[in-house]
Amino acid sequence: MSTNQETRGFQSEVKQLLQLMIHSLYSNKEIFLRELISNASDAADKLRFKALSNPALYEGDGELRVRVSFDETLGTLTISDNGIGMNREQVIDHLGTIAKSGTKEFLNSLGTDQAKDSQLIGQFGVGFYSAFIVADKVTVKTRAAGETQAVLWESAGEGDYTVADIEKATRGTDVILHLREEEKEFLSEWRLREIIGKYSDHIGLPVEIQTTEYNEEGKASGQKWEKINKAQALWTRSKNEISDEEYQEFYKHLSHDYNDSLIWAHNKVEGKQEYTSLLYVPAKAPWDMFNREQKHGLKLYVQRVFIMDDAEVFMPNYLRFMRGLLDTNDLPLNVSREILQENKITASLRAALTKRALQLLEKLAKDDQAKYQTFWNEFGLVLKEGVGEDFANKQQIASLFRFASTQTDSSEQTVSLADYVGRMKEGQKAIYFLTADSYVAAKNSPHLELFNKKGIEVLLLSDRIDEWVVGHLTEFDGKPLQSITKSDLDLGDLADKEQEESQKAQQAEFGSFLERAQSYFGERVKKVVLTHRLTDTPAVVSTDNDEMTTQMAKLFAAMGQKAPEVKYTFELNPDHQMVKKIADLTDETEFNDWIELLFEQALLAERGSLENPAAFIKRMNKLLG
């Protein structure tokens, strides 16, 4: 008998997600059972944790398990647990809304490409709502541990759901799926055993199925519950016993990801510290990767008792994409997030797990370049944060970076710093790089002309974070990183001695011209000089080593911060016909117009924009007319 019944509307995002999910994930519809058993397992973990301080929550029933049963006559499939359960408020919070920030933006990003959308929805984590892939109605009966009032939740997965108070003798949750007519394949003991064996063998508590007992004459004599999984936490088993398929299914259980992971590491450490870790590298970035408020981290167990999800303290922020768990004997069972923050054991575990994660990425890069490229394309921007956050591991982190380069003639970031160092020319002392807004802008920068002529490789950096990265990563393998856009560029032994002598002679020849140009610009430029870094372009602008670069100024602006004004050195190519022509001009107005136009062209090539483009166009039209 139900009382206090009310009908409530779904949060709008739930309705949209349900419709998209039913259509996008239908081709792999059996995952609904994995998701519901996984939720039941989590409910058991949470009860164990709460019962540490309040054993009465067990209510005399400490044998935790998940039970799967079906009724062919009613067309229902039921997944039951005796875990933590939910009260009315929790039911409304968990089953009527999606408590994830940015959900609306995520849903708006979905389009009409079903294959792509199914991957995105898989990254989002389908959870309880996956029941609607096969059911046209879902009924939930639940009672929270330690409470007397039970709750009924029911919905057809459309606009609303019903909540009511009911009686329920046992704690925990029953999820009853009223299967669609075309989904009756799941009303089969054989089919259910197959799915549970495939997806849930690793669950750390018994998964039982209702099966028929037969007497000696072969006639059905009743029903019994039979455990059909190993019921041993996967990470406590020997690595030699665990198949790749089991590791992958456990990853999906942990992360609620729809895709396989790229690689994993399962380690048991004994000695001064005792812990087991299981770390995974995902294949796809979650949709909210750059949401700093989104929780991340490892699942924490102490002595095989679940303590918390998203224990972020064990993994640095730049490795927030890592998934997995830590099971340690070195922390107390009553550990809290606050205690973790101030704990020496935590700091030691964090250092060890960070090393383990970086070694796992190194192994992936060494053993499977294609998979590593997949990783880099998804998570490279996040990993780059590490050079500013983790001084102790800076060189190891940098060795994992990949860049575009003049050597590959491709925008794909495939070149490591070790690759670059291995190809350095004899006498080359620095790793040369160029930062720009895009690969195309970098590839066509006039700053490359001299390097292309000499066949010197240059790394092309076009991610917004790159200028910040090279500010923290000043050297690699003993070789300094040097920007080729600096006015005090030094090629060392690679410099052309004859050209240097020629430049000295031209300096005298163009001396009055340079003074004239400097007089015109005044304080607008730091200085006007001749350059031999150009072959085809008449002029460029550059900055000194100790001054803010164009890209860093743009980064400040993107963060809403005011950056110091960038004052450029204006470099002119004395071998270019346009520069020679301007140097010969005697009319002051004409000279000023031409030298200004040249400066604006150089600024446009460097910054991609001008403060006053209309004036630039007017001046160009005037000089062309």
From Swiss-Prot:
SUPFAM superfamilies (alphabetical): ATPase domain of HSP90 chaperone/DNA topoisomerase II/histidine kinase, HSP90 C-terminal domain, Ribosomal protein S5 domain 2-like
Q: Where is this region: B?
A: 338-554
CDD domains the UniProt entry points to: HATPase_Hsp90-like
Q: Which domain of life is it from?
A: Bacteria
User: Positions of the region C?
Assistant: 555-625
Subunit record text: Homodimer.
Q: What is this protein called?
A: Chaperone protein HtpG
Look up and give the organism this protein is from. Answer: Actinobacillus pleuropneumoniae serotype 3 (strain JL03)
The primary gene name is htpG
